[in-house]
């Protein structure tokens, strides 16, 4: 959940601040540019659209370069172009940072971009486990 009392930049960098680690400014700039939020960094989050808030949340999730990212419908509020940019960013994080991304989606076209798909129906794994 984004904190409404903080602006976009502060929300994204919150995990870095809490961990008292150094900000990788190059990585930060790459994330915000890819997500199209570089012009919103000083904006209060309560003034953002749903899709913009979603992109800020994705940036915050990625800023610490996690080994594992759990993402529940990460592209749910995004238009097609932003969805593709987010998926490309996830793929880069996977390849360049070795981040494992476990994503839940109901969008067939998004799931087809994954390396592995596990289909769950009525709470049971239907296929995808080797």
Regions found by a protein language model. Name each.
Residues 58:
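Hydrophobic anchor residue at the start of the ABC signature
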Residues 80-82:
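Helix N-cap at the start of a conserved alpha-helix in ABC-type nucleotide-binding domains
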Residues 44-48, 52-54:
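Conserved ABC ATPase signature
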Residues 6-13:
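Short coil-to-helix segment of the ABC ATPase nucleotide-binding domain corresponding to the Q-loop/switch region
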Residues 69-72:
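Catalytic Walker B motif of ABC-type/P-loop ATPase nucleotide-binding domains
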Residues 43, 63-64:
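Conserved signature/switch motifs of ABC ATPase nucleotide-binding domains
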Residues 23-35:
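ABC nucleotide-binding domain "signature" region
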């Amino acid at each position: 959940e984004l904190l409404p009392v903080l602006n976009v930049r502060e929300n994204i960098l919150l995990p870095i601040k809490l961990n008292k680690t150094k900000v990788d400014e190059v990585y930060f700039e790459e994330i915000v540019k890819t997500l199209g939020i570089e012009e919103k960094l000083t904006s209060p989050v309560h003034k953002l659209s749903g899709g913009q808030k979603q992109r800020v949340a994705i940036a915050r999730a990625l800023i610490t370069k996690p080994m594992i990212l759990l993402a529940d419908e990460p592209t749910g509020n995004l238009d097609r172009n932003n969805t593709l940019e987010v998926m490309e960013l996830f793929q880069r994080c996977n390849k360049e940072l070795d981040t494992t991304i476990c994503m839940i989606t109901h969008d067939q076209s998004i799931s087809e971009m994954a390396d592995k798909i596990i289909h769950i129906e009525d709470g049971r794994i239907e296929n995808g486990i080797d």
